[in-house]
A protein has these predicted regions:
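Sec-dependent bacterial lipoprotein signal peptides
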Residues: 1-25
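Bacterial Sec-dependent N-terminal signal peptides
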Residues: 18-56, 183-193, 201-203, 207-222
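Tryptophan-anchored aromatic micro-motifs
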Residues: 39-80, 125, 218, 224
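Short, hydrophobic/aromatic-rich segments at coil-to-beta transitions
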Residues: 55-61, 98-104, 127-134, 162-170
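Generic short beta-strand segments
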Residues: 61-70, 103-109, 136-140, 168-172
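N-terminal glycine/threonine-rich, aromatic-flanked beta-hairpin/loop signature
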Residues: 72-129
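Acidic, glycine-rich flexible loop segments
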Residues: 128-164
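Short, solvent-exposed mixed-charge patches
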Residues: 227-229
Length: 229
Protein backbone atom coordinates (compact mmCIF):
# COMPACT_ATOMS: atom_id res chain seq x y z
CA UNK A 1 0.00 0.00 0.00
CA UNK A 2 1.37 3.43 -0.91
CA UNK A 3 2.15 6.08 1.69
CA UNK A 4 -0.63 8.27 0.25
CA UNK A 5 -3.29 5.54 0.50
CA UNK A 6 -2.15 4.65 4.03
CA UNK A 7 -2.48 8.28 5.11
CA UNK A 8 -5.97 8.48 3.60
CA UNK A 9 -7.01 5.28 5.41
CA UNK A 10 -5.71 6.52 8.76
CA UNK A 11 -7.53 9.84 8.30
CA UNK A 12 -10.79 8.02 7.53
CA UNK A 13 -10.41 5.78 10.59
CA UNK A 14 -9.81 8.82 12.79
CA UNK A 15 -12.93 10.51 11.40
CA UNK A 16 -15.09 7.44 12.06
CA UNK A 17 -13.82 7.23 15.62
CA UNK A 18 -15.05 10.73 16.53
CA UNK A 19 -18.73 9.80 17.14
CA UNK A 20 -17.68 6.93 19.38
CA UNK A 21 -15.43 9.20 21.37
CA UNK A 22 -18.22 11.71 21.83
CA UNK A 23 -20.89 9.22 22.80
CA UNK A 24 -18.63 7.51 25.31
CA UNK A 25 -18.24 10.70 27.34
CA UNK A 26 -21.61 10.56 29.09
CA UNK A 27 -21.40 11.93 32.61
CA UNK A 28 -21.30 9.19 35.21
CA UNK A 29 -24.12 9.26 37.71
CA UNK A 30 -23.35 10.70 41.12
CA UNK A 31 -23.66 7.34 42.80
CA UNK A 32 -21.69 5.15 40.36
CA UNK A 33 -19.09 4.07 42.94
CA UNK A 34 -21.67 3.56 45.70
CA UNK A 35 -24.12 1.85 43.34
CA UNK A 36 -21.74 -0.51 41.57
CA UNK A 37 -19.48 -1.04 44.56
CA UNK A 38 -22.21 -2.08 46.99
CA UNK A 39 -24.80 -3.40 44.57
CA UNK A 40 -23.00 -5.06 41.63
CA UNK A 41 -26.16 -6.94 40.60
CA UNK A 42 -28.38 -3.88 40.33
CA UNK A 43 -28.40 -4.11 36.55
CA UNK A 44 -30.17 -7.48 36.87
CA UNK A 45 -33.63 -6.46 37.94
CA UNK A 46 -37.27 -7.24 37.35
CA UNK A 47 -40.46 -5.45 36.53
CA UNK A 48 -41.23 -4.68 40.19
CA UNK A 49 -38.45 -2.09 40.24
CA UNK A 50 -39.89 -0.50 37.09
CA UNK A 51 -43.28 -0.32 38.80
CA UNK A 52 -41.71 1.27 41.88
CA UNK A 53 -40.08 3.95 39.76
CA UNK A 54 -43.35 4.59 37.93
CA UNK A 55 -45.17 5.13 41.24
CA UNK A 56 -42.39 7.22 42.81
CA UNK A 57 -41.88 9.53 39.82
CA UNK A 58 -43.98 12.65 40.25
CA UNK A 59 -44.77 15.55 42.54
CA UNK A 60 -45.71 14.85 46.15
CA UNK A 61 -47.00 17.17 48.87
CA UNK A 62 -47.49 16.76 52.59
CA UNK A 63 -45.64 17.03 55.89
CA UNK A 64 -42.09 16.32 57.02
CA UNK A 65 -40.73 15.91 60.55
CA UNK A 66 -36.96 16.30 60.74
CA UNK A 67 -35.26 15.03 63.93
CA UNK A 68 -31.60 15.68 64.72
CA UNK A 69 -29.19 16.24 67.61
CA UNK A 70 -29.03 19.87 68.70
CA UNK A 71 -25.60 21.29 67.88
CA UNK A 72 -26.06 23.97 70.56
CA UNK A 73 -26.75 21.56 73.42
CA UNK A 74 -24.66 21.80 76.59
CA UNK A 75 -21.41 19.78 76.69
CA UNK A 76 -22.19 16.14 77.42
CA UNK A 77 -25.89 16.65 76.72
CA UNK A 78 -27.51 14.96 73.74
CA UNK A 79 -30.65 16.90 72.97
CA UNK A 80 -32.89 15.73 70.16
CA UNK A 81 -34.83 18.35 68.22
CA UNK A 82 -37.79 17.70 65.92
CA UNK A 83 -39.01 20.27 63.42
CA UNK A 84 -42.07 20.03 61.20
CA UNK A 85 -42.29 21.44 57.68
CA UNK A 86 -44.83 21.53 54.91
CA UNK A 87 -42.98 19.89 52.03
CA UNK A 88 -43.19 19.30 48.32
CA UNK A 89 -40.91 16.67 46.77
CA UNK A 90 -40.66 16.04 43.04
CA UNK A 91 -38.94 12.88 41.78
CA UNK A 92 -37.67 12.81 38.19
CA UNK A 93 -36.53 9.51 36.75
CA UNK A 94 -33.38 9.24 34.64
CA UNK A 95 -33.88 9.26 30.88
CA UNK A 96 -30.82 7.03 30.56
CA UNK A 97 -31.88 3.38 30.31
CA UNK A 98 -28.78 2.34 32.23
CA UNK A 99 -29.90 4.43 35.22
CA UNK A 100 -33.63 3.80 34.97
CA UNK A 101 -33.93 2.96 38.68
CA UNK A 102 -32.55 6.33 39.72
CA UNK A 103 -33.04 10.01 39.09
CA UNK A 104 -32.95 13.51 40.46
CA UNK A 105 -35.35 15.59 42.49
CA UNK A 106 -36.23 18.89 44.11
CA UNK A 107 -37.55 19.42 47.63
CA UNK A 108 -39.19 22.64 48.83
CA UNK A 109 -39.74 23.06 52.59
CA UNK A 110 -41.83 25.67 54.39
CA UNK A 111 -41.69 26.10 58.17
CA UNK A 112 -44.29 27.63 60.48
CA UNK A 113 -42.54 31.00 60.24
CA UNK A 114 -43.23 31.12 56.51
CA UNK A 115 -39.56 30.58 55.58
CA UNK A 116 -38.81 28.34 52.61
CA UNK A 117 -35.81 26.44 51.34
CA UNK A 118 -35.22 24.48 48.14
CA UNK A 119 -32.95 21.43 48.09
CA UNK A 120 -31.74 19.37 45.17
CA UNK A 121 -31.30 15.65 45.64
CA UNK A 122 -30.57 12.47 43.75
CA UNK A 123 -32.28 9.15 44.44
CA UNK A 124 -31.96 5.49 43.56
CA UNK A 125 -33.57 2.17 44.37
CA UNK A 126 -31.69 -0.93 45.50
CA UNK A 127 -33.47 -3.41 43.24
CA UNK A 128 -32.41 -6.36 45.41
CA UNK A 129 -34.55 -5.35 48.37
CA UNK A 130 -36.57 -2.24 47.47
CA UNK A 131 -34.66 0.17 49.73
CA UNK A 132 -34.84 3.78 48.57
CA UNK A 133 -31.85 6.12 48.93
CA UNK A 134 -31.92 9.91 48.81
CA UNK A 135 -28.72 11.94 48.62
CA UNK A 136 -28.91 15.70 49.20
CA UNK A 137 -26.68 17.53 46.74
CA UNK A 138 -25.32 20.34 48.94
CA UNK A 139 -24.26 18.20 51.91
CA UNK A 140 -23.79 14.81 50.18
CA UNK A 141 -25.78 13.34 53.08
CA UNK A 142 -27.44 10.02 52.23
CA UNK A 143 -30.70 8.84 53.78
CA UNK A 144 -32.08 5.32 53.47
CA UNK A 145 -35.68 4.11 53.49
CA UNK A 146 -35.77 0.46 54.59
CA UNK A 147 -38.36 -1.55 52.66
CA UNK A 148 -38.33 -4.48 55.12
CA UNK A 149 -38.61 -2.62 58.42
CA UNK A 150 -42.04 -2.43 60.04
CA UNK A 151 -40.90 0.15 62.61
CA UNK A 152 -38.68 2.44 60.52
CA UNK A 153 -39.79 1.48 57.03
CA UNK A 154 -42.00 3.09 54.42
CA UNK A 155 -45.17 2.72 52.37
CA UNK A 156 -45.25 3.76 48.70
CA UNK A 157 -48.34 3.16 46.61
CA UNK A 158 -52.10 3.18 46.47
CA UNK A 159 -53.98 3.84 49.71
CA UNK A 160 -57.64 2.91 49.38
CA UNK A 161 -58.81 4.88 52.43
CA UNK A 162 -57.45 8.08 50.87
CA UNK A 163 -58.20 7.13 47.28
CA UNK A 164 -54.73 8.33 46.35
CA UNK A 165 -51.10 7.34 45.97
CA UNK A 166 -49.31 8.02 49.25
CA UNK A 167 -45.71 7.89 50.38
CA UNK A 168 -44.93 7.85 54.09
CA UNK A 169 -42.20 6.52 56.35
CA UNK A 170 -38.69 7.11 57.64
CA UNK A 171 -35.49 8.30 56.03
CA UNK A 172 -32.55 7.36 58.25
CA UNK A 173 -29.20 9.14 57.93
CA UNK A 174 -26.35 6.87 56.87
CA UNK A 175 -23.51 9.03 58.20
CA UNK A 176 -25.28 10.77 61.11
CA UNK A 177 -28.15 10.19 63.55
CA UNK A 178 -30.64 12.40 61.69
CA UNK A 179 -34.09 11.00 60.94
CA UNK A 180 -36.78 12.31 58.62
CA UNK A 181 -40.41 11.26 58.62
CA UNK A 182 -42.54 12.09 55.58
CA UNK A 183 -46.27 11.76 54.96
CA UNK A 184 -46.99 12.68 51.34
CA UNK A 185 -49.67 12.37 48.69
CA UNK A 186 -48.93 12.42 44.98
CA UNK A 187 -50.45 15.37 43.18
CA UNK A 188 -48.89 15.18 39.72
CA UNK A 189 -46.93 12.92 37.40
CA UNK A 190 -44.21 14.78 35.43
CA UNK A 191 -43.97 14.31 31.69
CA UNK A 192 -40.75 12.36 32.06
CA UNK A 193 -42.59 9.69 34.02
CA UNK A 194 -45.70 9.48 31.84
CA UNK A 195 -44.05 7.27 29.23
CA UNK A 196 -43.21 4.77 31.95
CA UNK A 197 -46.70 4.80 33.42
CA UNK A 198 -48.17 4.13 29.98
CA UNK A 199 -46.15 0.92 29.66
CA UNK A 200 -46.18 0.05 33.37
CA UNK A 201 -49.76 0.34 34.70
CA UNK A 202 -49.76 1.63 38.27
CA UNK A 203 -52.97 0.04 39.49
CA UNK A 204 -53.36 -0.47 43.24
CA UNK A 205 -49.75 -1.46 43.84
CA UNK A 206 -47.85 -0.65 47.00
CA UNK A 207 -44.29 -1.18 48.16
CA UNK A 208 -42.55 -1.31 51.53
CA UNK A 209 -43.77 -2.95 54.72
CA UNK A 210 -45.00 -0.02 56.81
CA UNK A 211 -48.78 0.27 57.12
CA UNK A 212 -49.27 2.59 60.13
CA UNK A 213 -48.50 6.28 60.21
CA UNK A 214 -46.31 7.73 62.93
CA UNK A 215 -47.96 9.99 65.51
CA UNK A 216 -45.65 12.34 67.45
CA UNK A 217 -45.78 11.88 71.22
CA UNK A 218 -44.04 15.15 72.06
CA UNK A 219 -44.31 18.82 71.12
CA UNK A 220 -42.50 19.67 67.92
CA UNK A 221 -39.98 22.50 68.00
CA UNK A 222 -40.99 25.77 66.34
CA UNK A 223 -38.33 26.01 63.66
CA UNK A 224 -36.39 29.17 62.98
CA UNK A 225 -34.63 28.68 59.72
CA UNK A 226 -33.67 25.17 58.69
CA UNK A 227 -31.16 22.63 59.94
CA UNK A 228 -28.52 22.00 57.29
CA UNK A 229 -29.17 19.03 55.08
Amino acid sequence: MSIRKLSQLLALMALLAVPFALTSCDDDWYYDDYWNGYYPDNDNNGSEADQMVAVLSGRWQGDMVYTYTDDNAKPGEKKRVSEKYAVEMTFYRSENAKDRYAGQGVEVDRNDQGDTQALNFTWWIDTRNGDIYIKYTDSNTIFRMDAASTDYGYHLGWETSRNAYTFFGYLVGQSNDDEIYIDLERVETPRKAKAATETTPLGAQSFGSTVDRWTPTWTLTSSKGFHRR
